[in-house]
């Protein structure tokens, strides 16, 4: 009698965040089905969990139009090759992890061949280019969404979607230890502390750093002992920030950190940050915040017309109201930013209420996402 084939899951991750998700999913699946086989495009973490890498994840990790165009031929070749090889392999389920421009077309190709497909991490279709939802619906059997309002959006279009909670909410404690974070960063327990996070991209750091520094200078007038910490994602961004600081506030003492953004948020009484995942992480760190963001005028004009949501930051989208002050474009200037941060640093009613709401929102999206994703994969495999 022929030996029964083990459960076979094909996966494609296109960047580091996807590698983390893929590794967590593989771990949860292996705990239930130890002999399951995992193949596809994987980073080092997925490979460490036993995923066979037909291609290295770095092959897909290209950003920006110029880089994508330069690699387009190679990317199209990889996608065509994966379509063929997965078609021959006939995995029980294909899971495309994020990387929507690459994965959603691949999912569609495989679904046409009768292979069950999951897209893990919803693109921001609820915010802009909403018509993409129809292609996603045609290409996938199920979307796994991190956030409850994403599921509500897909439900409107009858696209199968499962809210699984957010892996970051699982990884972070409900009540972070502020004192321990300060000890790790060498910040005295008795002083007020402000974290500045001017973004992870070069363009953001260029646009925001000077105004963020001027804001901290204004706040120092009220709080002379204010400590300012600035976590920077890499050496390039640190160099860039140091140059801007030398031009803007050469005498101001700030503590620059290499990474350590999470510790900086937990240790701080308030944070000023660019929007993006940092705002969600800051919420989970229970650090009251103000979001400041600016882009080139034409980009902002275009975004205003394309973006369909009332807010840009995830805490506000989760709360369904302006929980966190958002100061965008012309409003993103030192006087306004300082005025918004002032009540948060005062450590009174405003920051306490924000802290409590952050905790409630954290509980709402803390659902053991790796396990839920594994449940979804196995349920689809059985159908």
From Swiss-Prot:
Keyword field: Glycosyltransferase, Lipid A biosynthesis, Lipid biosynthesis, Lipid metabolism, Transferase
EC class name: transferase
Enzyme Commission code: 2.4.1.182
Listed Pfam families: LpxB
Gene that this polypeptide is encoded by: lpxB
Domain of life, per lineage: Bacteria
Presence of the UniProt keyword Transferase in the record: yes
Family (UniProt): Belongs to the LpxB family.
Source organism (scientific name): Klebsiella pneumoniae subsp. pneumoniae (strain ATCC 700721 / MGH 78578)
Classification via HAMAP family: LpxB
Protein name as it appears in the record: Lipid-A-disaccharide synthase
Entry keyword annotation includes Glycosyltransferase: yes
